[in-house]
Swiss-Prot record:
InterPro entries: ApoA-II, ApoA-II_sf. This is Apolipoprotein A-II. GO terms for cellular component: chylomicron; spherical high-density lipoprotein particle; very-low-density lipoprotein particle. It is found in: Secreted. The gene is Apoa2. GO terms for molecular function: apolipoprotein receptor binding; cholesterol binding; cholesterol transfer activity; enzyme binding; heat shock protein binding; high-density lipoprotein particle binding; high-density lipoprotein particle receptor binding; lipase inhibitor activity.
Length: 101
């Protein structure tokens, strides 16, 4: 019986010591965590900027813009012509209809 009591007492003391050590452990510094996070994000942004090379990116954007413009200008002109023709036909149709009173 004494052996059982000693074992229970020993287990209790060990678990209390463990809990005490966990409470005394320092909590991570949130400000340090945030500064480390922002440093990581900043360095990642710098690396990404160096990898993309702004001149290459600007040239790609310019070529995409030119291709888009080449494709859209004829479509816009055609749509404008068709709209003008439709409005002209509507006006002529109004003129040719007799006035009903």
């Amino acid at each position: 019986m004494k052996l059982l009591a000693m074992t229970v007492l020993l287990v209790t003391i060990c678990s209390l010591d463990g809990a005490l050590v966990r409470r005394q452990a320092e909590e991570p510094d949130l400000q340090g965590l945030f500064s480390q996070y922002f440093q990581t994000v900043t360095s990642y942004g710098k690396d990404l900027l160096q990898k993309t090379k702004p001149q290459d990116l600007q040239a790609q954007v310019q070529s995409y813009f030119e291709k888009t413009q080449e494709q859209l200008v004829p479509l816009v002109k055609k749509a404008g012509t068709e709209l003008f023709n439709m409005l002209s036909n509507m006006i002529e149709l109004k003129k040719t209809q007799p006035a009903t009173a």
